[in-house]
Amino acid sequence: MEIYKEVGKPAEVVKRFQIAKMKGTHGIGHTRMATESAVTTLGAHPFSTGEDQCLVHNGSLSNHNSLRRELIRKEMTFETENDSEVAASFITYRMNSGRTLKEALESALVELDGFYTFVVGTENGFGVLRDPIACKPAVLAETPDYVAFGSEYRALTSLPKIEKAKVWEPEPATVYFWGH
Protein backbone atom coordinates (compact mmCIF):
# COMPACT_ATOMS: atom_id res chain seq x y z
CA MET A 1 0.00 0.00 0.00
CA GLU A 2 1.31 3.42 -0.91
CA ILE A 3 0.14 6.59 0.84
CA TYR A 4 0.36 9.98 -0.87
CA LYS A 5 -0.58 13.02 1.21
CA GLU A 6 -0.41 16.66 0.28
CA VAL A 7 -2.15 19.97 0.81
CA GLY A 8 -3.57 21.54 -2.33
CA LYS A 9 -6.26 21.35 -4.94
CA PRO A 10 -7.12 17.77 -5.97
CA ALA A 11 -6.12 18.26 -9.64
CA GLU A 12 -2.71 19.59 -8.57
CA VAL A 13 -2.12 16.67 -6.19
CA VAL A 14 -3.18 14.13 -8.84
CA LYS A 15 -0.72 15.69 -11.29
CA ARG A 16 2.12 16.01 -8.76
CA PHE A 17 1.96 12.33 -7.79
CA GLN A 18 0.99 11.10 -11.28
CA ILE A 19 -2.03 9.30 -9.86
CA ALA A 20 -3.47 8.63 -13.34
CA LYS A 21 -0.48 6.42 -14.17
CA MET A 22 -0.81 4.23 -11.08
CA LYS A 23 -1.97 0.65 -11.25
CA GLY A 24 -3.72 -1.35 -8.56
CA THR A 25 -6.99 -2.79 -7.42
CA HIS A 26 -8.23 0.14 -5.36
CA GLY A 27 -7.43 3.68 -4.32
CA ILE A 28 -8.78 6.06 -1.70
CA GLY A 29 -8.59 9.82 -2.03
CA HIS A 30 -9.89 12.62 0.17
CA THR A 31 -10.39 16.36 -0.10
CA ARG A 32 -10.46 17.77 3.39
CA MET A 33 -12.18 20.77 4.90
CA ALA A 34 -10.40 20.98 8.25
CA THR A 35 -12.63 21.77 11.21
CA GLU A 36 -10.57 20.65 14.19
CA SER A 37 -6.91 20.64 13.23
CA ALA A 38 -4.42 22.49 11.07
CA VAL A 39 -4.33 22.21 7.29
CA THR A 40 -0.96 20.53 6.91
CA THR A 41 0.43 17.58 4.97
CA LEU A 42 0.72 15.66 8.25
CA GLY A 43 -2.97 16.33 8.95
CA ALA A 44 -4.05 15.38 5.43
CA HIS A 45 -5.90 12.15 4.73
CA PRO A 46 -5.59 9.22 4.42
CA PHE A 47 -4.28 8.20 7.82
CA SER A 48 -2.31 4.98 7.96
CA THR A 49 -1.73 3.64 11.45
CA GLY A 50 -1.22 -0.02 10.59
CA GLU A 51 0.39 -2.15 7.96
CA ASP A 52 -1.65 -2.13 4.75
CA GLN A 53 -4.50 -0.11 6.25
CA CYS A 54 -5.61 3.49 5.74
CA LEU A 55 -8.66 5.56 6.65
CA VAL A 56 -10.37 8.69 5.40
CA HIS A 57 -13.06 10.30 7.51
CA ASN A 58 -15.76 12.88 7.04
CA GLY A 59 -17.19 14.04 10.34
CA SER A 60 -16.20 14.75 13.90
CA LEU A 61 -15.61 12.47 16.88
CA SER A 62 -16.61 13.91 20.25
CA ASN A 63 -14.76 11.29 22.31
CA HIS A 64 -11.47 11.32 20.40
CA ASN A 65 -9.45 12.71 23.33
CA SER A 66 -10.50 9.99 25.78
CA LEU A 67 -10.13 7.34 23.09
CA ARG A 68 -6.64 8.65 22.25
CA ARG A 69 -5.62 8.31 25.93
CA GLU A 70 -7.00 4.77 26.03
CA LEU A 71 -5.14 3.80 22.85
CA ILE A 72 -1.89 5.36 24.12
CA ARG A 73 -2.19 3.14 27.21
CA LYS A 74 -2.43 0.24 24.76
CA GLU A 75 0.84 1.42 23.14
CA MET A 76 -0.63 3.05 20.04
CA THR A 77 1.24 6.19 18.94
CA PHE A 78 0.01 9.42 17.35
CA GLU A 79 1.61 12.07 15.15
CA THR A 80 -1.24 14.62 15.08
CA GLU A 81 -4.13 15.96 17.11
CA ASN A 82 -6.52 14.92 14.33
CA ASP A 83 -9.59 12.89 15.33
CA SER A 84 -9.30 10.97 12.06
CA GLU A 85 -5.95 9.59 13.19
CA VAL A 86 -7.66 8.39 16.37
CA ALA A 87 -10.30 6.61 14.29
CA ALA A 88 -7.59 4.99 12.15
CA SER A 89 -5.70 3.90 15.27
CA PHE A 90 -8.89 2.48 16.76
CA ILE A 91 -9.46 0.35 13.64
CA THR A 92 -5.79 -0.70 13.59
CA TYR A 93 -5.87 -1.71 17.26
CA ARG A 94 -8.99 -3.81 16.72
CA MET A 95 -7.54 -5.50 13.63
CA ASN A 96 -4.23 -6.13 15.41
CA SER A 97 -6.29 -7.83 18.12
CA GLY A 98 -7.53 -10.36 15.58
CA ARG A 99 -10.72 -8.75 14.36
CA THR A 100 -11.63 -8.48 10.70
CA LEU A 101 -12.17 -5.07 9.13
CA LYS A 102 -15.92 -5.68 9.32
CA GLU A 103 -15.71 -6.51 13.05
CA ALA A 104 -13.44 -3.51 13.72
CA LEU A 105 -15.89 -1.17 11.98
CA GLU A 106 -18.83 -2.71 13.85
CA SER A 107 -17.04 -2.04 17.16
CA ALA A 108 -16.62 1.59 16.06
CA LEU A 109 -20.41 1.89 16.09
CA VAL A 110 -20.38 1.04 19.79
CA GLU A 111 -17.28 2.91 20.95
CA LEU A 112 -17.04 6.06 18.81
CA ASP A 113 -19.20 9.08 19.62
CA GLY A 114 -19.92 11.63 16.95
CA PHE A 115 -20.98 11.81 13.36
CA TYR A 116 -18.85 10.20 10.71
CA THR A 117 -18.46 8.34 7.49
CA PHE A 118 -15.33 6.19 7.22
CA VAL A 119 -13.72 4.64 4.18
CA VAL A 120 -11.01 2.18 5.20
CA GLY A 121 -8.65 0.53 2.73
CA THR A 122 -6.75 -2.67 3.36
CA GLU A 123 -4.65 -4.87 1.10
CA ASN A 124 -7.76 -6.98 0.45
CA GLY A 125 -10.24 -4.22 -0.44
CA PHE A 126 -12.08 -1.40 1.26
CA GLY A 127 -14.94 -0.87 3.68
CA VAL A 128 -17.43 1.94 4.30
CA LEU A 129 -19.27 2.81 7.50
CA ARG A 130 -21.68 5.63 8.36
CA ASP A 131 -22.62 6.62 11.90
CA PRO A 132 -25.97 5.41 13.33
CA ILE A 133 -27.88 8.54 12.28
CA ALA A 134 -26.11 8.97 8.91
CA CYS A 135 -25.31 12.58 9.68
CA LYS A 136 -22.65 13.01 6.96
CA PRO A 137 -23.57 12.72 3.28
CA ALA A 138 -22.41 9.66 1.36
CA VAL A 139 -23.07 8.10 -2.03
CA LEU A 140 -21.77 4.91 -3.64
CA ALA A 141 -21.69 3.93 -7.30
CA GLU A 142 -21.20 0.34 -8.46
CA THR A 143 -20.57 -1.04 -11.92
CA PRO A 144 -19.10 -4.37 -13.03
CA ASP A 145 -15.77 -2.51 -13.36
CA TYR A 146 -15.59 -0.37 -10.22
CA VAL A 147 -17.03 0.79 -6.94
CA ALA A 148 -16.73 4.50 -6.17
CA PHE A 149 -17.57 6.53 -3.10
CA GLY A 150 -18.11 10.24 -2.60
CA SER A 151 -19.73 12.63 -0.18
CA GLU A 152 -21.84 13.96 -3.04
CA TYR A 153 -23.00 12.56 -6.36
CA ARG A 154 -21.32 15.38 -8.25
CA ALA A 155 -17.94 14.00 -7.13
CA LEU A 156 -18.72 10.89 -9.19
CA THR A 157 -20.18 12.45 -12.34
CA SER A 158 -16.96 12.30 -14.38
CA LEU A 159 -16.46 8.57 -13.82
CA PRO A 160 -16.72 6.30 -16.86
CA LYS A 161 -20.24 4.93 -17.45
CA ILE A 162 -21.58 6.58 -14.30
CA GLU A 163 -24.97 6.85 -16.01
CA LYS A 164 -25.15 3.02 -15.99
CA ALA A 165 -23.92 2.62 -12.41
CA LYS A 166 -26.06 1.52 -9.52
CA VAL A 167 -25.93 4.70 -7.42
CA TRP A 168 -27.13 4.56 -3.83
CA GLU A 169 -26.79 6.03 -0.38
CA PRO A 170 -25.29 3.65 2.20
CA GLU A 171 -27.51 2.87 5.17
CA PRO A 172 -26.63 4.17 8.64
CA ALA A 173 -24.81 1.83 11.05
CA THR A 174 -24.09 -0.66 8.28
CA VAL A 175 -20.66 -1.95 7.26
CA TYR A 176 -20.02 -2.45 3.54
CA PHE A 177 -16.94 -4.20 2.15
CA TRP A 178 -15.62 -4.81 -1.35
CA GLY A 179 -12.73 -7.21 -1.79
CA HIS A 180 -10.63 -8.31 -4.69
Regions from the language model: what does each represent?
Residues 1-180:
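Conserved short alpha-helical segments that host acidic/polar catalytic motifs at enzyme active sites
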